[in-house]
Amino acid sequence: MKMIKVKVIGRNIEKEIEWREGMKVRDILRAVGFNTESAIAKVNGKVVLEDDEVKDGDFVEVIPVVSGG
């Protein structure tokens, strides 16, 4: 089984998600309860866009966005 490791920064969430062909960053965000407006992602240490594809074995860090006034 091919997997992607995911860690949500600032929360105690670390999990592995099964990788699928054509999987994108937005799919990973949704899998851990975020959308593209509520978090940004780094793949293997680089900030990425929601439409970027992820590969088997990638390490994804999800960084929740804090906003307000």
Swiss-Prot record:
Gene3D superfamilies registered for this protein in UniProt: 3.10.20.30
Cross-link (Glycyl lysine isopeptide (Lys-Gly) (interchain with G-Cter in SAMP2)): K55
SUPFAM superfamilies in alphabetical order: MoaD/ThiS (SSF54285)
UniProt entry keywords in alphabetical sequence: Isopeptide bond, Nucleotide-binding, Phosphoprotein, Ubl conjugation, Ubl conjugation pathway
UniProt cross-link Glycyl lysine isopeptide (Gly-Lys) (interchain with K-? in acceptor proteins), position: G69
Organism superkingdom: Archaea
Modification 1-thioglycine, positions: G69
NCBIfam families: PRK08364.1
Name of the protein in question: Small archaeal modifier protein 2
The species this protein was found in: Pyrococcus furiosus (strain ATCC 43587 / DSM 3638 / JCM 8422 / Vc1)
Gene, per the UniProt record: samp2
